[in-house]
Amino acid sequence: MKIRGFFALLLTGLLAAVAAFAGQPVAELYDKAEYRIAMRDSVALYTAVYTPKAPGEAPVIIFRTPYGCGPYGAGRFPQGFEKGYLRSYVDRGYIIVMQDVRGRYMSEGDFEHVRPAGSGETDETTDSYDTVDWLVRHIPHNNGRVGFAGCSYPGFYAMMGGLCGHPAVKAVSPQAPVTDWFMGDDVHHNGVLMLTDSYRFLSSMNTPPGRVPAAKMPSMSRQTQPDERTFFLEHTALAELTGLLKPNPFWEEMSAHPDYDAWWQERDLRRACYNVQPAVLIVGGTFDAEDCFGAWNLYRALNRQSPSTPCHLVVGPWAHGAWRNGRTLGAFDFGSDASWEYYMEHFEVPFFDHYLRDGNTDEAAPLPAAAVFSSGDNRWHTFGRFLSRGARKLTLYLAGGGILDTRRPTAKTSASTYVSDPSDPVPYCEVSGLRRPKEYMVADQRFLFGRPDVLTFVSEPLEEDMTLVGPVDADLEVTLSTTDADFVVKLIDLF
């Protein structure tokens, strides 16, 4: 049997010229200044500004982060300025701004996870506005045009920058953006607690008393050492897991809201995405185990709720954030067109250059509305704003005898049963280690065949390739012998 499924979308981009000083040490090209920018409530946010020494006006790109924007101190530059993703902005002479968000690392104030827009006198939109306003008035040689970019949690802050309303903000790129921590990103997947990731991640996000440099911030939690699966099988009660943590207000508050109630709903980024003024470039990966949901669904929300916003989507065959550093995943090499160099040259750099350097805010960037990479033929495909246009609906039926078929079963009644043992849950990867491997998203799943708690339905071998575009919905009719259950449905390719 074969089902070849690709979530495919894509685009073609512009070639961008590289500045003449490409390859020079960054200290020869840039000056660094550190500021504590006062917000409207007098809370000061640590902000590092890297300004090109070359004469002339330059656009500003801002990266706001809860993870620390070190190295701190005069004359010290991030290692990423020498090569890779950030080097693209160095070589193009952007004014690069990095800021610790409120309550994190060297910034003052109280940190709040996914602080909702409009939740008080200050939030991430007001902090973004106040930062931009200070920068355009105080940083020499800026051209008055500002962008925000960020990946994962910083992707949330990038979108908040796009919602801040400052007229200088012309373009933003939320990448793998935290959008809804209950429905799909990081903490839950379809409302089911993603325990391995959320427990490790949220326990690492406690801010210690006072402001300390990044080198002294707590490292990623080691609560799940030495073996992740064994750890969680030995600590099955949520209260027990909570007791192993240092005091963690967000974990405790989250645990008190097991359902999609108003507390979660107000933390859905999409609720604020109306009448968005800057252009938006959303980036995601089909094999992103953390925040795949955010990219697709933020794009849909913007098209529906803010139709006049120039909005672009790029989704490649990447794990979380891998468009910034690689083209391979596990045993698969998706080719040079999936490399970070290709991504930057064809998508991100042309996007920001168009709106920030060239100032073409009256016309859309020369990018497709949506570009998606098909991991079957290793090609980019382009789409209009509505991703499923031209596609046809496909229904697959689970039939008796473990058959997966496009034809509706003729039997009037049919049932498949299994017994799930909580003491031996179905593993998501064949080998359990210190933490979840990103490669599990493309790993061979046949090690699960034959387990008594897994039902497998297999089609006839496909006679030709099949490309899947759009969401996959599972419609199950079930009878339980217990009070509740979570179901995981996988549509996979046997090759």
Task: List where the protein language model places each region.
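N-terminal cap/lid segment of alpha/beta-hydrolase-fold proteins
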Residues: G23-G56, V458-E464, E477
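Cap/lid segment of the alpha/beta-hydrolase catalytic domain
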Residues: K53-R137, V187, N325-G335, R451
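Accessory cap/linker subdomain of secreted extracellular hydrolases
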Residues: E82-K83, D91, T125, M160-N275
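Alpha/beta-hydrolase fold nucleophile elbow
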Residues: P140-S152
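Glycine-rich nucleophile elbow surrounding the catalytic serine of serine-hydrolase chemistry
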Residues: G150-M160
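C-terminal, loop-rich substrate-recognition/catalytic regions characterized by aromatic stacking residues
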Residues: S221-T236, T328-F495
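Short beta-strand/loop motif that positions the catalytic acidic residue
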Residues: V276, I282-G284
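Conserved alpha/beta-hydrolase "acid-adjacent" motif
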Residues: A289-W296
